[in-house]
Amino acid sequence: IMKIQNSSDRREITMKEILCFGDSNTYGLIPGTKKRYDRDTRWTGLIEQQLYGKGYRIIEEGLCGRTTVFEDELREGRKGAALLPTLLESHAPVDRVVLMLGTNDCKTFYNASAEVIGLGVERLVEQIRKADQNIRILLISPIQLGEGVWEPGYDPEFNEKSVEVSKGLKAVYQKVAEKYDCDFLAASDVAEPSKEDREHLNKEGHKKLAEAVLGVLAA
């Protein structure tokens, strides 16, 4: 609760917190670079613009390389399940969580199927439910990896199997959403990876995803 006080007015405003927990496509990585889109371009920022003045605040928690439950031995702190409970506590009370992870889980050194990645997502959903049964969850299956993402000049951490696994996430996540009574959105239905790196959203992709997410949040 935020208290605002001036010489003529004192009132309380209760802001609803929406935690967006994801990877580089929530962080807003610019395709083919190590730079970040500005807040006015990122899908999280676009949502915040539309919800401004309506009692909502967006908490951006996107991290490049983040997975659901897998440890990245090359980069520390990427295991989503290791951090999510802390974030839920530090930002409490959280009204909603928008959860979009799974792309990095498709990397070759995890060797995970879509079904196993789905179990990782279940773990995260269970963590949210444990923190607060009243938190409303929007589970988003990520965009698909582009064909040839493994080719020289792109991302060698993926291969052909990675692309196939990414294509299977939509159906798996939808079942998880039904099991745990989550809202569901398939990012692959509204956006696709950029031609620049075959992996990340471009400006148009961020715009399309923001519009789709807003549609679910407003329902």
What is each stretch, according to the model?
Residues 1-8, 131, 137:
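Short intrinsically disordered, low-complexity coil segments enriched in acidic
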Residues 4, 11-63, 69-74, 87-91, ...:
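Serine-esterase "nucleophile elbow" of acetyl-processing enzymes
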Residues 7-10, 103:
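Intrinsically disordered, low-complexity regulatory regions of eukaryotic regulatory proteins
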Residues 54, 78-219:
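Alpha-helical cap/lid subdomain in secreted, periplasmic
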